[in-house]
Regions:
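Bacterial N-terminal signal peptides
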Residues: 1-8
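PEST-like low-complexity, intrinsically disordered acidic/proline/serine-rich tracts
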Residues: 13-295
């Protein structure tokens, strides 16, 4: 817990990180890993389901303007997921170490992510992050260090991408903190996103991976864009104008909560918000019960 809280205070402007970058002090994470997607269904979330996400008004407006048909555009069909998001979907993950041939200390930890065939480098040699004006990529620029036997990774220089699969955005100013913690044949991946544009507080997620010893995993992602919607006018981008999204209340109605709660914000992350929902439910139900009793 202390590890998460201290890591969550890191901001994108941080150029150096405290602690030793001794590449030989941690648990070996090498191997092929497959996700256990039990924490968040890859088919979720629903449109206008922002409950529990500390988004800004700008992120909410972006999300409500988003139309799922946008994913059918040829330029979006093969668009790579950014590092904070890519671990949440179906993938196979391979991890290995690059070591100095003389000292055998770890210079970098490499990751190959099968989704969109992404190669990621986590530098372990103590180097600084580059200038904010350096190129931004889908995987960003990552440095790592061992903490308590686990690997902590700091990533900047990310392109703008998705925070969740319902249109919530993540800006190119976002920074990612990760903890890779191995427990035998299982590995917990904790990700913490700080985004000064679209988040008011850090957004924390976890995924669990299982070590795969057998062959047969699919490591390729031969994506090729095609025309999915016939006769779409050239240059048309599916979207909703402010106030015109017809699905704003769909998730809220299905789960019997207020639209305001479904639209998220930092307040909705905390247990205290449950009391507010219960009070709202009582206020809604009580008049009906009273009217029925008077008949």
């Amino acid at each position: 817990m202390l590890l998460l809280l201290s890591a969550g205070l890191w901001t994108p402007g941080t150029a150096q990180f405290a602690g030793s970058f001794n590449g030989s002090a941690g648990t070996d994470l090498s191997g092929s890993w497959s996700p256990l997607p039990h924490e968040e269904s890859t088919g979720n979330p629903a449109i206008a389901e922002y409950f529990g996400v500390p988004i800004t008004e700008g992120a909410r407006a972006w999300g409500l303007a988003w139309d799922p048909s946008r994913l059918t555009l040829p330029e979006h069909q093969c668009q790579v997921h950014v590092a904070p998001y890519i671990f949440g979907g179906p993938l196979n993950l391979r991890i290995w170490e690059d070591k100095d041939p003389q000292s055998q200390t770890v210079i970098a930890i490499r990751q190959y992510i099968s989704t969109y065939e992404q190669n990621r480098t986590i530098w372990m040699d103590g180097r600084s992050h580059p200038s904010p004006n350096a190129p931004h990529t889908w995987m960003g620029f990552s440095t790592g260090k061992w903490e308590g036997g686990g690997l902590t990774v700091y990533t900047t220089h990310l392109k703008q991408g998705e925070l969740r699969r319902n249109g919530l955005p993540e800006s190119d100013q976002a920074a990612l903190i990760e903890h890779f913690i191995r427990h035998g044949d299982y590995m917990t991946h904790v990700s913490i996103v700080n985004d000064p544009v679209y988040l008011t507080e850090p957004f924390v997620r976890t995924q669990v991976f299982r070590l795969v010893l057998s062959e047969g995993l699919n490591w390729l992602y031969p994506c090729e864009s095609v025309v999915e919607i016939a006769n779409r006018p050239p240059g048309k981008v599916p979207h909703y104008l402010p106030g015109e999204n017809p699905f704003v209340s769909e998730f809220a109605d299905k789960h019997h909560i207020t639209v305001g709660a479904a639209l998220g914000g930092a307040e909705t992350m905390y247990p205290e918000f449950q009391l507010k929902l219960k009070k709202a439910a009582v206020a809604t139900i009580t008049p009906r019960n009273t009217a029925a009793a008077n008949k």
